[in-house]
Amino acid sequence: KRPNPATAKRLRRNARPRMGDAWAWAGRRIRPATPDGLPVATARSFNRAPGTVRITGGTIKGRKLDVPAGDGVRPTTDRARETLFNVLTNRFRKPGGSSVLAGARVLDAFAGTGAMGLEAWSRGADFVAFVEAQSTHFATLCDNLRAAKLPTDAGTALRNHEGLKTTDRSIDIIIADPPYEQGQALLTALLARQSALWHADTLLVWEHPRGGGTEAGFDGWEPVHQT
């Protein structure tokens, strides 16, 4: 027996994936309680897929990016990245209501393929610094930036975070997806060593293993969104 049109429409709507299927909850941005308090958004890891990944929104939506071969490569899936950037776009706003990504200076701190930073640029970021230490991954990153036709004044690829000192302005959004086995230690060191680049409204997005030690947090930062 075929359902009537109203029932069929309701079934299709209910079958669609919801933001809640990927995120436990999304909170509003909380203003720091102290002058040196800085906001942090944390995101759990999602399943990974090898091969190629695609930009999911913005001016270069659909652009394919290569993924370097190797056991240590774990690019975030397209669906998970789309969910994360939907949260950034819809939940975090500048005074006046524009997206936090609009005109932002972004750090893709452990860039890999560069998908996170390119997604940010595609969706309105003004400048992205991509940092990738592993030589094979760095070569793939540079190939992906060229394929995406990233203008030279809209981004730079670096082999280490010390190169960030050559940037002449502070960072608005840090996107960090470090190696899981030493992720919190690497990120803690980065936040301390490059502290001159962060300002009072810098937003940190950290992807970490499910159930992986976020309780300790980071000195000077407070959570405003967690899944």
Regions found by a protein language model. Give the residues of each.
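Class I S-adenosyl-L-methionine-dependent methyltransferase catalytic core
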Residues: 1-227
